[in-house]
Amino acid sequence: MSRDFSREKRLLTPRHFKAVFDSPTGKVPGKNLLLLARNNDLDHPRLGLVIGKKSVKLSVERNRLKRLMRESFRQHQDSLVGWDIVIVARKGLGDVENPELIQHFGKLWKRLARSRPTPEEKSEPAGVDSTDA
């Protein structure tokens, strides 16, 4: 899988965001943010960002956060295959320094990847049932 952040790896329409908000299968709270995820049945993850003016006042800070989030996602997307992910920023996130944010996102991606049941666990019982039948 390529490590780019092309258009196909973004949540673009309100419908995509609504699907994740309405029925998240994974939820990882973090410091000053919330990470929501939903299975997407694709061979790549997709990312959506919600950073409002109420949470982070200055556009410079909002843009910095978006750059850091996208870059962290791009670097960790191999472990996030099959998720639609929405990151919701909360008050105070703009005050966190870059190195701390990068480290924090690394931990969040790992927690999200661990929360997904592995495909082997899903297919094993089906395989056992089909061989017995």
From Swiss-Prot:
Domain of life: Bacteria
Transmembrane domains' residue ranges: none
The keyword RNA-binding appears for this protein: yes
GO molecular function annotation: 3'-tRNA processing endoribonuclease activity; ribonuclease P activity; tRNA binding
BP GO annotations: tRNA 5'-leader removal
Record's keyword annotation contains Nuclease: yes
Family annotation (Pfam families): Ribonuclease_P
Keywords: Endonuclease, Hydrolase, Nuclease, RNA-binding, tRNA processing
Region listing for Disordered, in residue ranges: 114-133
Enzymatic reactions: Endonucleolytic cleavage of RNA, removing 5'-extranucleotides from tRNA precursor
Gene Ontology CC terms: ribonuclease P complex
EC number: 3.1.26.5
SUPFAM superfamilies (UniProt xref): Ribosomal protein S5 domain 2-like
EC class: hydrolase
Subunit structure, interactors included: Consists of a catalytic RNA component (M1 or rnpB) and a protein subunit.
Annotated function: RNaseP catalyzes the removal of the 5'-leader sequence from pre-tRNA to produce the mature 5'-terminus. It can also cleave other RNA substrates such as 4.5S RNA. The protein component plays an auxiliary but essential role in vivo by binding to the 5'-leader sequence and broadening the substrate specificity of the ribozyme.
Matches recorded under HAMAP family: RNase_P
Family to which the UniProt record says this protein belongs: Belongs to the RnpA family.
Protein's name according to its UniProt entry: Ribonuclease P protein component
Organism listed in the record: Pseudomonas syringae pv. tomato (strain ATCC BAA-871 / DC3000)
